[in-house]
Amino acid sequence: MIMSSRSFLEYRAMFALEERDLDGVVLDCAGGASGFVAEAGTRGVRAVAADPLYAHGAAVLSERLSAGLEQGDAMIDANAERFVWTWYGSAERRHELRRAARRAFAADIRRRPGSYLAAGLPRLPLAARSVDLVLCSHLLFTWADRLDQEWHRAAITELARVSRGEVRIFPLVRMGDGEPVPFLGALLADLRAAGLSCEVRQVPYEFQRGARHLLAVTGSRTG
């Protein structure tokens, strides 16, 4: 899987975030090297990130991120027809946002290590309903070729367990080929049968062609 570094601005667009969505505690899972928590902190937003990679030292994180950036760029180059540049405007603008996010993450994890939890799905060391909003970027569904339907069910159920409000997941297509996730419909049926509310919403962001929807999940009230 690729470790990436997306910006606060990208998160706002991908997750259709409004100011009121950021009033409570926000969990970014899996956070990777996203700059979201860092910039959220400068805006007075209470945000934390979770990722198993945070258990490693700065050198390992830097190495993984460098490799991830190279892999991501190579994947984009190899599948150029599957990407839309309207939101970014240019490749350089995307690179600028990613470089700034990477710098913000690197500085913030040193300055505020308590905001970065070394943990991963499908089980988080967090109490039930301990955050107000969960954001999950480019993990669920993105890697559906490696993570099966049962893993997704367990992971989403866990994210809903720790959230008092919504879980927002983006995107809903697979990495690289941008194809629909074959088990999405069956998974949503399973989640709804378990008492979770699931809603697919369009967002004001599209980079991977066809990836312009998020999944919002609410409803878990058990620990």
Regions found by a protein language model. Name each.
Residues M3-V25, A33-F36:
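Conserved alpha-helix/loop element of class I SAM-dependent methyltransferases that forms part
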Residues T42, R46-G114:
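Class I S-adenosyl-L-methionine-dependent methyltransferase module
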